[in-house]
Design a protein with these regions (language model features):
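N-terminal small-domain helix-loop-helix segment of the aminotransferase-like
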Residues: 6-8, 13-25, 29-121, 128
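Conserved PLP-anchoring active-site segment centered on the Schiff-base-forming lysine
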Residues: 132-154
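Short acidic capping loops at alpha-helix termini that bridge into adjacent secondary structure
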Residues: 109-116, 136-139, 186, 247
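A short helix-loop-beta submotif of the ANL/AMP-binding
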Residues: 156-161
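Aromatic/hydrophobic pocket-lining residues that form π-stacking "cages" and hydrophobic walls in ligand
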Residues: 39, 43, 150, 211, ...
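Single conserved hydrophobic/aromatic residue that forms the stacking wall/gate
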Residues: 245-256
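Active-site phosphate-binding strand-loop segment of PLP-dependent enzymes
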Residues: 162, 166-234
Length: 256
């Protein structure tokens, strides 16, 4: 006589509870379509309807690279050693050249091995810095108006956004008196961007020194997003050149 097999733990197929539907992570619930993506679609619709929209939004070059640049890229692409994986921190020659560039234009000495990280774009940098410094609920100071990525990445990592106003009557610079009156408890990071997008306002050594002093006073990381330093600017400036070190301790301000 055939023995009856014991029932499998968990019951039969008919009695197993239904597996819940897979849902996205909570961190993406507040993520919206990127600002410029929405605007470019809007511009495309306007152009299709006959409007001639002049796009002053994204800082995309409207001129091609120089012939010498294109030739150098073609020569590099033809080399057999340029098509594999690169080091995760960039090749040493590239980082060393970045360090020489900072010394030449800003008078800043940087350690290529520990203070330079090549990235594929500013968004990657904003994400890396936010992930490195911001826990859920930490405060981050974001300029208004300002680069939309600061806010979108801050929302993604669950940070608490504290906008600070840039006003024309103040030359589009932070109002430090207003900042000092804010509740800065829990604030760990402050984004600034000069030459500024979207106002076009330029920075100054005096402004950067105020930002450095503000960051040190409140133990806030100041991150200077500096992609427009050489656009219509006779005196390119980096916040790193304004650091006044009082000891050989590690750098206490993050910038570019």
């Amino acid at each position: 006589m055939k023995k009856q097999q014991p029932a499998e733990l968990g019951g039969s197929e008919e009695t197993k509870p239904a597996k819940p539907t897979v849902t996205p992570a909570r961190r993406v619930e507040n993520v919206e379509e990127y600002y410029f993506s929405v605007k470019l679609k809007e511009v495309a619709r306007m152009n299709e309807s006959g409007a001639r929209v002049i796009n002053l939004g994204i800082g995309s070059p409207d001129l091609p690279p120089s012939a010498e640049t294109v030739q150098a890229l073609c020569q590099a692409a033809a080399r057999p050693d340029t098509h594999g994986y690169q080091p995760y921190v960039g090749i040493p020659e590239l980082r060393a050249e970045f360090a020489r560039w900072y010394k030449r234009w800003y008078g800043v000495d940087l350690d290529p091995a520990n203070e330079i990280l090549p990235l594929i774009g500013s968004k990657e940098g904003v994400m890396h810095i936010s992930l490195a410094f911001l826990n859920e609920g930490d405060g981050v100071l974001i300029p208004n108006p300002g680069y939309p990525t600061y806010a979108s990445v801050s929302k993604f990592v669950g940070a608490r956004i504290l906008p600070y106003a840039l006003k024309e009557e103040n030359d589009w610079q932070p109002d430090f008196e207003a900042l000092e009156k804010m509740d800065l408890s829990g604030v760990k990071l402050m984004w600034c961007n000069y030459p500024n997008m979207p106002t076009g306002a330029n920075g100054s050594r005096e402004l950067f020194e105020k930002l450095v002093a503000f960051g040190r006073r409140h133990n806030i990381v100041i991150c200077h997003d500096n992609p427009y330093s050489f656009i219509l600017n006779d005196r390119p400036l980096s916040i790193l050149s304004c650091l006044l070190y009082t000891s050989p301790s590690p750098r206490d301000i993050s910038g570019s």
